[in-house]
């Protein structure tokens, strides 16, 4: 969960002040990017960032429904705002994102104080929806929509690294996942629109971009179904080449990939383009072919390993991360051990792990052989221990080496340190100090020497 509390823009709003706003974001990078865009819309409308959540005139929760724990947090936050609204009737409460799409009218019945409830496909319509609220309506916007190309400038949380959505929605039907039902069908943005946004970021001084999509390597395939001219050529590989030479952008990343669409052509392209960073996040979810089939993932462990082996052959220094779910319905001890074996064999730099959480309206939630909480806790603890040990082992290769770091921020826990990431996405901390009488600035690319390693971060000194 992240909170968007941004500095006030230097550019005056086009419209008169309408009060303060606060956005709290739950969940994935797509939600973070959506929140930045909604912040831009609110400031265009005349809102300004609040200093505190409980003092805001408009509160927006951009929600996640991938796990039950995320939902419960939202309900807790909404309860607090509902109490506020009873004494502050002009307070506006907005719920956006995947939980809003999933629950719809039932959420309005549960929390009638909500003024606007809208799914992810409606983020770019925030202004018109709030205008309906201002006319006295309680607004529900969850119908499937074509996502408008928004010309409003996002109010970005960083002035160095920018998110760029390139494909919305998901056409997969994983049996545990609600994303297709809440984010809709795949919809790729045109290469021209994406390039224009990246060029604007470069002009504003951004050094790194991360291209985003639920299944980013499926980019462009919906163009083919629409019979657009030259649509077969529009792929993620094509897009990377198309935007690569934009002046000012030093690094390009992308997430999240689906193994089914991760091609040798894409790997070859990444190896040829110097701005594309050597980090690949490719979720595997399980090391058992039986479980992968039950999950509806559409690939085997053997095909997944082929992808990883090809990456390692073409880009030997690449870092590889993934996602894993343990305690999926029917997962035997053997299935679970196969997941541990896969992690140990591939030696992932990092794995995001989770115990299976039944989600409403998904096939797996109704299946027999649901595993109990004790097994979930045990397996999650064990896999996390393995992931941490391997991550520290993998990080040893950086010790005493020189690495390029993009300075992103001051360490929030130590104001005497700066922080940034290597090209392989290793978070790195190093001291603030003068070089030729001048302190390094945020947004600079510098060389450091790695002096110490931890499982999920590095410590360095300036060269």
Curated annotation (Swiss-Prot):
Residues 396-463 form the TRAM domain. This is tRNA-2-methylthio-N(6)-dimethylallyladenosine synthase. Residues 156-393 form the Radical SAM core domain. InterPro entries: Elp3/MiaA/NifB-like_rSAM (IPR006638), Methylthiotransferase (IPR005839), Methylthiotransferase_CS (IPR020612), Methylthiotransferase_N (IPR013848), Methylthiotransferase_N_sf (IPR038135), MiaB_methiolase (IPR006463), rSAM (IPR007197), rSAM_horseshoe (IPR023404). Coiled coil: none annotated. Its main location: cytoplasm. It is found in: Cytoplasm. [4Fe-4S] cluster 2 binds at residues 170, 174, 177. It comes from Prochlorococcus marinus (strain NATL2A). It is an enzyme of class 2 (transferase). It catalyses: N(6)-dimethylallyladenosine(37) in tRNA + (sulfur carrier)-SH + AH2 + 2 S-adenosyl-L-methionine = 2-methylsulfanyl-N(6)-dimethylallyladenosine(37) in tRNA + (sulfur carrier)-H + 5'-deoxyadenosine + L-methionine + A + S-adenosyl-L-homocysteine + 2 H(+). GO terms for cellular component: cytoplasm. The keyword Cytoplasm applies. It comes from the Bacteria. Binds 2 [4Fe-4S] clusters. One cluster is coordinated with 3 cysteines and an exchangeable S-adenosyl-L-methionine.
């Amino acid at each position: 969960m992240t909170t968007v509390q941004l500095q006030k823009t230097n550019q005056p709003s086009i419209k008169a002040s309408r009060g303060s706003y606060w956005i709290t974001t739950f969940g994935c990078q797509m939600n973070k990017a959506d929140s930045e865009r909604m912040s831009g819309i609110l400031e265009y409308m005349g809102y300004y960032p609040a200093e505190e959540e409980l003092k805001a005139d408009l509160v927006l929760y951009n929600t996640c429904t991938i796990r039950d724990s995320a939902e419960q947090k939202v309900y807790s936050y909404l309860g607090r705002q509902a109490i506020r609204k009873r004494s502050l009737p002009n307070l506006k409460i907005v719920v956006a994102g995947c939980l809003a799409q999933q629950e719809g009218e039932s959420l309005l019945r549960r929390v009638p104080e909500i003024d606007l409830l809208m799914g992810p496909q409606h983020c770019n319509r925030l202004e018109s929806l709030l205008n309906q609220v201002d006319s006295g309506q309680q607004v529900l916007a969850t119908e499937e929509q074509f996502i408008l190309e928004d010309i409003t400038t996002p109010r970005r949380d960083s002035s160095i690294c920018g998110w760029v959505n390139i494909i919305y929605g998901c056409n997969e039907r994983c049996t545990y996942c609600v994303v297709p039902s809440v984010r809709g069908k795949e919809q790729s943005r045109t290469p021209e629109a994406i390039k224009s946004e990246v060029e604007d970021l470069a002009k504003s001084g951004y050094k790194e971009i991360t291209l985003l999509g639920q299944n980013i390597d499926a980019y462009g395939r919906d163009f083919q179904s629409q019979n657009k001219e030259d649509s077969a050529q529009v792929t993620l590989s094509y897009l990377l080449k198309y935007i690569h030479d934009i002046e000012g952008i030093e690094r390009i990343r992308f997430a999240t990939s689906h193994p089914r669409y991760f091609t040798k052509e894409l790997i070859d392209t990444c190896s040829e383009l110097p701005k594309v960073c050597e980090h690949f996040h490719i979720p595997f979810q399980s090391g058992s072919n039986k479980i992968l089939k039950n999950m509806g993932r559409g690939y085997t462990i053997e095909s997944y390993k082929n992808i990883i082996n090809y990456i390692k052959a073409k880009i030997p220094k690449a870092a590889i991360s993934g996602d894993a779910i343990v305690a999926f319905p029917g997962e035997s001890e053997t299935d679970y051990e196969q997941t541990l074996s896969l992690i140990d064999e591939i030696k992932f730099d990092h794995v995001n792990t989770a115990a299976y959480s039944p989600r409403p309206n998904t096939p797996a939630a109704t299946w027999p052989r649901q595993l109990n909480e004790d097994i979930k806790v045990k397996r999650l603890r064990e896999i996390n221990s393995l992931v941490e040990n391997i991550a520290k082992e993998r990080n040893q290769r950086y010790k005493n080496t020189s690495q390029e770091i993009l300075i992103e921020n001051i360490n929030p826990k130590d104001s005497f340190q700066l922080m940034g990431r290597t090209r392989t996405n290793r978070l790195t901390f190093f001291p603030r100090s003068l070089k030729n009488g001048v302190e390094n600035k945020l947004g600079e690319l510098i060389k450091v020497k790695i002096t110490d390693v931890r499982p999920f971060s590095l410590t360095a000194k300036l060269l």
